[in-house]
């Protein structure tokens, strides 16, 4: 078998990883030491290569290595450079592509290994999955200092078989000698934790946030061996934040090892000082917030009923200032425009925080990593992300807290233009609305602007630097004047007070913001797979009705421009290409025939769920159960990918038939 240089390198790396896992070097050293001691003690001190090989053969080391490295035909024929298709329902048994990593010899690295789990008691009775059988899986997502990793999915079990390692670069960006290798003292001053998110994926493709944990890694600085092992207990989220989910076996190791370690007392003292400083800053901010709130109520007693939200609970039920949930976030080359950012946020799934028992809405503002890894969240999560992205694009953006129709609590995003233009952004669908206030004192003959937005009341607005409470006589959005510099209309909080607890690095309890990740979804492959599944479902549906199904591939292909046009319109607000689509359909449908089409949009890739939703539409059902002469059916699926593997899925069902009436 001849291999290209690239594939040969990949193969060498796989063999190297296998040898490392088997600890072959350690075995060779042990054999060498034993051979030198026992067999060559009285002979000459020269040990030849043949002597060593004979000793290795006698002890079975070489045979073990050969057996471990024996590749079957499937492994030989596999293309090592292709990226395996990520599993959605089934366990991914394929060997992952080994990515080449440029390791800077002048940098320090933290090797974090997750070596299994235990006491995941919710899955105590979980049966062992059969090969190829669909089962629920666990995945661990990790973030540390702008570096993100994701573990291989493993079957849910009482003792899940996590076997993953992550190489984390440890350095200080803001130091003048940032190119130098970080020593123990420098690393001790790096207070960023390693955030671990545990996600469960069930057999229907639904994701659940199981646990969110912040790992303090600096205990490795006091280890004489440069390694330390930890039993990390994961707690639940929301109402279950005090309940243990399970325990992860974690091993930390520094590369290269420290030449000088720190004493346990120094590390303990540093962590204690950081906690004390954080607690003091948070205490002072709470004292200030209480005083500010008393002043706000003195303006007008009715302010007590307004939605002025200063603090919000995260997934671990920790109270944080709302300003800490927003920060300018640049998407690199993943998103090009603010409107594209709004479209991306809108295709992330919407799901309210689960409530145990009855009662009102469960409050849970997720940290950004938890929201992105789960790929869905409540409207507050969407708004915080959208506001952060708009700030990253240089806009003056704020999150608005208020209500929409029927008094339902809601949040949305507002941008304030340099010319005073106020634009509302709905994070759940990407819609934009211009705000023009109504003047209640205007004469009856004066035409007032019509409000197209669904928002009714507004209590406060905030971003990473500002918090402003609405103190106008009415908190109605349509009457609101957004002159943010007028303190008679908007009562501000001290920017210094906000900065003391919300700016990056101000407190050790503040979760760092992760970068966005590019999509790993192959749009063409996913589109084709969904289309084939829908064809099968339609054929079976018509078969149950006693109808035959004839597909026309050309008609299906002609539906593509329409789906592309719909997505462009959602992103830019501009409708383009409709004339060409209509002209092509007219040419494809003969005289005397009728054409019907039904487009629909989803943010998931579950064919059965999508098909069940489509059948609830009478118009779609009319197409799928169409009876007539010379019936030809068509279906087209177009998957549009966005960062974080979010997808906008457009489906169009169509039919053409000869009219007999």
Which residue stretches match the model-derived regions?
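His-Asp-centered catalytic microenvironments across diverse enzyme cores
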Residues: 229-238, 246-255, 264-298, 373-374, ...
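Acidic, S/T/P/G-rich intrinsically disordered/coiled linkers that flank
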Residues: 1-139, 143, 147-149, 190-192, ...
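Short proline/glycine- and polar residue-rich coil/turn motifs
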Residues: 155-162
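Intrinsically disordered, low-complexity regions enriched in proline, serine, glycine
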Residues: 121-126, 150-154, 177-180, 205-209, ...
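Eukaryotic beta-sheet cores, primarily in C2 and C2-like/PH beta-sandwich modules
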Residues: 112, 137-142, 163-217
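Secondary-structure boundary elements
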Residues: 286-378
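Eukaryotic intrinsically disordered and solvent-exposed regulatory patches
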Residues: 95-100, 123-128, 150-155, 167-171, ...
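C2-type phospholipid-binding modules
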Residues: 124, 189-263
């Amino acid at each position: 078998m001849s291999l290209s240089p690239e594939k040969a390198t990949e193969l060498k790396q796989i063999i190297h990883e296998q040898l490392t896992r088997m600890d072959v070097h350690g075995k060779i050293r042990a054999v060498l030491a034993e051979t030198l001691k026992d067999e060559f003690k009285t002979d000459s001190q020269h040990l030849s290569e043949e002597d060593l090989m004979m000793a290795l053969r006698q002890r079975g080391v070489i045979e073990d290595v050969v057996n471990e490295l024996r590749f079957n035909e499937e492994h030989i024929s596999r293309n090592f450079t292709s990226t395996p298709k990520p599993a959605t329902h089934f366990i991914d048994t394929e060997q992952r592509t080994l990515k080449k990593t440029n390791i800077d010899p002048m940098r320090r690295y933290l090797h974090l290994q997750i070596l299994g789990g235990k006491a995941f008691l919710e899955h105590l009775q979980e049966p062992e999955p059969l090969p190829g059988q669909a089962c629920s899986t666990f995945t661990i997502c990790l973030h540390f200092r702008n570096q993100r990793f994701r573990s291989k999915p493993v079957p849910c079990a009482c003792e899940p078989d996590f076997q993953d390692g992550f190489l984390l670069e440890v350095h200080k960006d803001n130091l003048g000698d940032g190119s130098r290798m970080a020593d123990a003292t420098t690393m001790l001053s790096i207070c960023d934790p390693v955030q671990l998110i545990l996600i469960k994926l069930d057999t229907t493709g639904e994701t659940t946030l199981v646990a969110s944990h912040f790992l303090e890694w600096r205990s490795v600085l006091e280890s004489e061996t440069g390694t330390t092992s930890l039993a990390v207990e994961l707690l639940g989220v929301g109402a279950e934040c005090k309940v243990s989910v399970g325990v992860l076996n974690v091993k930390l190791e520094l590369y290269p090892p420290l030449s000088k370690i720190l004493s346990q007392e120094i590390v303990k003292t540093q962590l204690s000082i950081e906690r004390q400083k954080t607690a003091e800053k948070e205490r002072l901010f709470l004292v200030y917030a209480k005083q500010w709130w008393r002043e706000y109520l003195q303006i007008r007693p009715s302010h007590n009923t307004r939605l002025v939200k200063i603090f919000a609970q995260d997934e671990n039920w920790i109270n944080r200032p709302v300003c800490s949930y927003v920060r300018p976030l640049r998407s690199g080359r993943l998103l090009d425009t603010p409107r594209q950012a709004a479209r991306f946020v809108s295709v992330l799934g919407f799901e309210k925080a689960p409530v145990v028992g009855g009662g009102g809405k469960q409050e849970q503002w997720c940290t950004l990593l938890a929201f992105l890894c789960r790929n869905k969240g409540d409207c507050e999560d969407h708004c915080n992300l959208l506001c952060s992205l708009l700030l990253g694009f240089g806009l003056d953006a704020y999150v608005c807290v208020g209500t929409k129709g029927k008094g339902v609590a809601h949040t949305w995003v507002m941008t304030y233009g340099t010319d005073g233009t106020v634009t509302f952004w709905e994070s759940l669908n990407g819609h934009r609305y211009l705000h023009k206030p109504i003047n209640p004192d205007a004469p009856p003959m004066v035409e007032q602007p019509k409000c197209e937005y669904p928002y009714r009341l507004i209590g406060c607005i905030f971003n990473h630097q500002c918090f402003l409470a609405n103190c106008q006589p009415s908190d109605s959005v349509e009457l609101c004047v957004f002159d943010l510099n007028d303190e008679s209309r908007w009562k501000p909080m001290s920017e210094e007070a906000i900065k003391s607890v919300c700016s990056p690095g101000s407190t050790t309890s503040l979760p760092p913001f992760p970068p966005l990740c590019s999509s790993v979804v192959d749009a063409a492959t996913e589109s084709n797979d969904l289309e084939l599944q829908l064809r099968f479902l339609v054929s079976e549906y018509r078969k149950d009705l006693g109808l035959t199904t004839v597909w026309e591939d050309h008609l299906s292909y002609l539906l593509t421009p329409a789906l592309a046009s719909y997505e462009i319109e959602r992103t830019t607000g501009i409708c383009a290409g409709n004339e060409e689509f209509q002209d092509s359909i007219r040419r494809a449908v003969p005289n005397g025939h009728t054409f019907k089409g039904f487009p629909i949009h989803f943010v998931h890739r579950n064919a059965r769920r999508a098909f069940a939703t489509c059948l609830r539409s009478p118009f779609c059902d009319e197409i799928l159960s169409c009876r007539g002469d010379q019936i030809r059916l068509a279906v087209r699926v177009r998957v549009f990918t966005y960062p974080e593997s979010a997808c906008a899925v457009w489906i169009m069902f169509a039919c053409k038939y000869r009219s007999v009436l």
